[in-house]
Regions:
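Long, cytosolic, alpha-helical-rich C-terminal regions that act as interaction/scaffolding modules
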Residues: 102-107, 111-194
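Intrinsically disordered, low-complexity N-proximal targeting/linker segments that flank membranes
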Residues: 1-104, 108, 113-114
């Protein structure tokens, strides 16, 4: 059944973009993913990433799939967090081009899930301050923090197993960092849905 599904989806993708698609998992199709997805799907996507990381790191998820995907309240709900706040520092990484900035910051590599009040408190912070907010939250969020990698042998093994050398702490977050995170998510999604 998987072969039939892959065949049909590649045919549909080819028709839609007017270009032959060889595989349903091509980075060119994933590169700009984010803005075009509804919020619940984004939460589902990151819940699956979180579950994959937890399994690979031989630990339990910090939140359940149900909580990550369905809870939306201001106290216990999970919300989309933009790593790049809408401020002058973030905009400067895009040479002041606000349209480009808004497109880029909404890609999957530029967002995470944060619990209600954490998300509200980090809303317009500078990136260096956001890193503190990400401590102790979800595993995917913590991969931005350098201290997450210290003495974390399971994570080192995970990076080697999936050839994710670029997955490392980021003391600054700019356009290149966002692209790196997008590529990492593509590799992880390819593993989850392969």
């Amino acid at each position: 059944i998987r072969d039939i599904f892959d065949s049909e989806i590649t045919k549909q993708l080819s028709n839609r973009i007017q270009h032959e698609v060889i595989s349903p998992f091509e980075y060119s199709l994933f590169k700009n993913t984010g803005e075009n997805l509804n919020t619940r799907f984004k939460r589902y996507f990151f819940a699956r990433v979180e579950g994959f990381l937890a399994d690979e790191l031989k630990t339990s998820m910090r939140q359940t799939y149900d909580d990550l995907v369905t809870k939306t309240g201001s106290v216990t709900g999970f919300h989309i967090e933009h790593i790049l706040s809408h401020n002058d520092e973030s905009l400067s990484h895009f040479n002041g081009d606000e349209e480009l900035f808004l497109l880029e910051r909404n890609r999957l590599g530029g967002i995470l899930l944060l619990k209600g009040k954490d998300n509200i408190s980090s809303s317009n912070e500078l990136y260096v301050n956001k890193l503190q907010t990400y401590a102790g939250t979800l595993l995917w969020n913590e991969t931005l923090r350098e201290d997450f990698y210290k003495s974390n042998l399971d994570f080192q093994n995970f990076r080697e197993k999936y050839k994710l050398d670029e997955l490392q702490g980021m003391n600054k977050f700019n356009r290149e960092s966002l692209e790196t995170r997008q590529k990492i998510l593509f590799k992880i999604a390819s593993q989850i849905w392969s």
